[in-house]
Amino acid sequence: MQIASRKVIAGLMVLALCITTLSSAGSDVEAKAKASLKTKKIFVKVGKKKSILIKNKTKKYSYSFTSSNKQVAKVTSKGKVTGIKAGKATITVKEVLKKGKKKKGKKKKRTLGKVKVTVTGMKKKNVVTPTPETVNKAAATAEVKTTPTATPSATAPVEPTASATPAASEPATPTPIVTRSPAPRPTLAPGMPELDKNNLTVADYPGIASDVPDLDIIRVGQNYYMVSTTMNLVPGVPVMKSTDLVHWEIVNYACNRFPNRDLFNLENGQQTYKNGSWAASLKYNEKTKLFYVIYNVNNDGFYCYTTPDIENGTWKAYYIQTSFHDPALIFDGDGMYVIYNGNNIQKISLKESSAEGGIGEVVKEGGSRALFNKTLGGFKWSLWEGAHAYKIGDYYYLMIIGSYGSWFRREVCYRSKKLYDSKASDWEAQLIFEGSTYEYGTGIAQGGIVDTIYGDWYGFLFQDHDGLGRVPSILAVNWDYVDTKNNKYYPDWPMMGYYDDKGNFVNCLGTSQKVKNPLTIQLNKSDKENYIVGDDDFSYPDFKEGDSLKKVWQWNHNPDDANWSVTENPGYYRIKNGKVAGNIWFARNSLTQRTVGPNFTSETCVLTENMKPGDYAGLAAISAHYGMVGVKCDENGNRYVFQGCNSDTNSGAKAKKEDRIEENDVSEEKIEGNAPVYLKIEYAFNTGKTRADRANFFYSLDGENWKSIGETFSLGFDTATTFMGTRSWLVNYATKEAGGYVDFDYYKVK
């Protein structure tokens, strides 16, 4: 019994010791495990709530929460944060020792840390669905002008709202919820169209499957106007019109002719291929009630054109012999400014010519300077150009194309609350788009932004598309983008991207990222088709000197007006060889039209009885180089159908007067009298799924039975030759003697 009792007592003592030890250890752990913040950042929408979490809380302490900006975010005593309005705030969290709990060495109060809060979006009650009732109500109270001289979007006095979620009856492509922009949303003016949710336009990729590079778009009223680059072609700087950002038609040209100089007239071996009019900028000024187009002509100078009527008016020209590469025009107050070379600014004014109908003068006001360094933001750009300039809300925005050394293009944006008097430190930089599309893998860049009458915003950029050229596309814009995956917020930046299958905005910021869906645009679909190419039977019964051909036509360089006609043989386009040219590059009066992808056909018919020995006439595919199907007249005056291409097809080969066409194939049939010869080129362009970029040539002597002739011609894009996408030309030129001519009966596209 005594032994047993001793064992029991000993066991109890050991157990007590273990309990004491464990209790002591637990106290040490508790002492070491201090409370800390689990929540470091919070993203919350207006009207929504989120809680701040604290690790290792104990009953000995209470916790206080203080907001640095209660107008943005409020916080309760329990740590619940409520978004009040879009913006940023900081919540300071403190730990306070409760009364009666103080021990020696313990602090009564300490700061646990700070929680960064970002509030985005708007309260649900502020989300407005544009219905016929609300549109009509707004229209009844509005006093905004509806003519093409209405106030441009960037300065319209409006109130921020958000557009609607898709209606149940809408097509499969989701209609996104468009977030706020830094500029207030417009009130619909009387007469503006109601938004029909069942008839919205959809932008696929590419937006226009044709060569429309360096585009600039503005909105005036409910109409959109676009200008682009056409290099050596005239009339130059085409003006296109749309009401839905998808369907476009050519309505005018800013530049009727280049100056009367050898390099613009293809005289004395000079030419301006890959040069001419570059990267035009288009603006409308509400104060002057004028439209302005500015652009640089390489090897010549800088031009500004103005007109009160962009669709039907004539243009007044102003000039200065200087170079403003890739200029962007912006008006600020009464000042007129040109942004060029990406980041340089020059104030200018316009001086009228003393001669009636003369060219006015562009005057530099003071010196030019760089607004900031292109390394701003830590970027290391190689290519960096093509600025577009805007004043929206509190900020001035510049949007520029950039690449790091590879060919992949990106769109970067810069902003400041000052412009002409800004310092470099006033500017910020942000990459706003880096990606491609499901249709093609090259980067999309160089462009700007435009809004709608309903307050939504869209980006317009272009993409290198090999032989087809540089093609434009429309992207979604989000001014209030929250990247929840990476915990990043981009307030007041025009982030570009697309909407996924659930209607969520997706920004592309990586070379492997792609726009995956067509874009439903919050505009009523136009009932018009694109008119950037078209047929012509050359019937101009009322044509008189100074009149123009159909808007789809442009000449290669300045035409020689004495040697073309649509009236000498009515119903035909006649090209006379006023001089010996030697090759297609120097042939005067060649008429050109764009091609359209992915498949396209050009067809014509030509009468050749009046050709002279050494003459070539027909239909040509002009790409990085040229291929042609047509009629040749040999040294004996006999005429045959042939197919050929230029002799120098090396990459980077420039147009030279010495170049001669190489005949790949000649038909056996001799052409008698004025028998018509029918010519056709069938194009196939690269897509994301097929590699083509080729042209095949055909001819017919009766217009019904077609024969293939010659070799398949490889298309391409070369900055050293034409710097343009593939075009079809109607051409006639002499290699031995002048005086011959041909008549083209029609031109058809399919």
What do these predicted ranges mean?
Residues C18-D28:
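C-terminal segment of classical bacterial N-terminal signal peptides
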Residues P176-V178, P182-K750:
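Carbohydrate-active catalytic/glycan-binding domains of CAZyme proteins
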Residues M1-L12:
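Bacterial N-terminal signal peptides that target proteins for export
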Residues M13, K40, K50, Y61, ...:
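Cysteine-rich, disulfide-stabilized extracellular repeat modules
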Residues G26-A142:
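Extracytoplasmic soluble-region selector
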Residues K123-T187:
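Ser/Thr/Gly/Pro-rich low-complexity, disordered linker/stalk segments of secreted
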